[in-house]
Each structure stands twice: as C-alpha cells, then as structure tokens.
Amino acid sequence: MLMKHGMSLFRYLLTTLFLLVIFTSSTSYSKKAAIVIDFDTKEVLFEVNANTKNYPASLTKIMTLYILFDRLEKKQITNQTKLKVSRIAASRSPSKLYLEEGSTIKVEDAIMALIIKSANDVATVVAENISGSEKDFAKLMTSYAKNLDMNS
C-alpha cells in the first residue's frame, strides 16, 4: 500500500516541481534540462537537454520528502517530532531557513520548508536526524531509489 500511495505522491511531487519550474522561470530552456515521462506508457511527453548531466538538487529534496512521508506512515516519526539542528546544517548555504545550531524544527515544518523553500539547511537536518550523516542518508536515498526502480 505504501508503494502505491507513496509512488503516486512521488509522481505528483515530481510533476508539480516540473510545472512550477516551467511556469515560474523567466529564463530560456536552453540552459536547463527537463523531461516528463508518462509513468504508465513510458512515453516522453516533454524534454529539453534530457541527456545532459546535472546536479540533482531539488530531486534530492523530493526523495528526502518521500523518505519523511514513509517514516510518518510507518509511525517511526510524527509531525510533532523535533529534529535537532547541527552546526553543519546551520552552516548550509542558501536556499535556507537560517536555522541556528542547537535549535529544533518539527517534522511538519521541515516538510513545508522542503516543499516551499527547498531549504538546504532543513534537508541536512532531516538527513542527519534520520541517518546520522548526509553520507549515510545518501546511501538510504539510493536504496529507496533502487526499490522504486529508479536509475540514472
């Protein structure tokens, strides 16, 4: 059930992010890359520079959200769970919420910050609180991606 609902949510978030970028961007597509694929038919609906290698940036935030939603559904955390902010997280460059070392942020607020602001400091807070480090969280994201049959 999680995979069905989780995948639907994941597809929704990806599509929303894509559309948000398209409709709010004032620059041309020549410097960006995008691809939209129909999940069921595998038909490419739209693509621009789809084969160019790029840093995944916001896609990692979407996977971070996916993992948070999975943990919420499994009741491993709640919306009220407080995530501690480390020195590393507080030092992340923009986009950020300017969280202070030693402070906390509730899961529900972290979710909103990731969706609305794509906050790097919050992504680091989530990673460190779930996996202990960004490096270990990256391994967890890779594991989730493989379970979702995602590949590069």
What residues fall within each predicted segment?
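Bacterial N-terminal signal peptides that target proteins for export
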Residues: 2-14
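Active-site-adjacent loops and short helices of periplasmic peptidoglycan-processing enzymes
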Residues: 24-152
